[in-house]
Amino acid sequence: NSSVIKSPEAIDSLNIPQIGILPRVEKLKRGFHILQMFIEDGASSFSEAIRSSRAIIESKFEKNKSYMITSSNPSEGKTTYAFNLALSLEKTSKVLFIEADIRRPSVLNGFYQFDRQILGLGEIISGSANLNDAIFKVPGTELDIITSGEKRFDMSDIVSKDQIKK
């Protein structure tokens, strides 16, 4: 497919600021989870790429307080990159990670166990929870997180709500 960007040179030609290129993670070490690779395998090339991204963000984009990671295709590693970057950034800044993929939540898929009911972005938008009830601390870190919440299938009901406009 000629519309897919496959090289750093192709990215450079777009004149869009970039904060890094991640190496493909072919195989995880036994007992490691990709969402915590930055913590669990700090010596990996993946973790080094995350640290480089953090350094670029802190130097080039110091005025920005919000960052969004997105792409047009599923399963490209957006959540993996964003979550590991948040784990890195929380070492030097206060960070709130918001998992906004309400249709396909990843962060909670049995990975973290919280000591209370999970309320998330879906519940905030639907009006069944407020912001403070939906913020969780990631165990073992200072990272705050708002998960997607319960898995949602009827997005049209949620997106049409007045709460999303707020």
Predicted stretch roles:
Residues 128-150:
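Switch I (G2) and immediately adjacent beta-strands of P-loop GTPase domains
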Residues 1-96, 100-122, 128, 137, ...:
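Short boundary/hinge segments that flank catalytic cores
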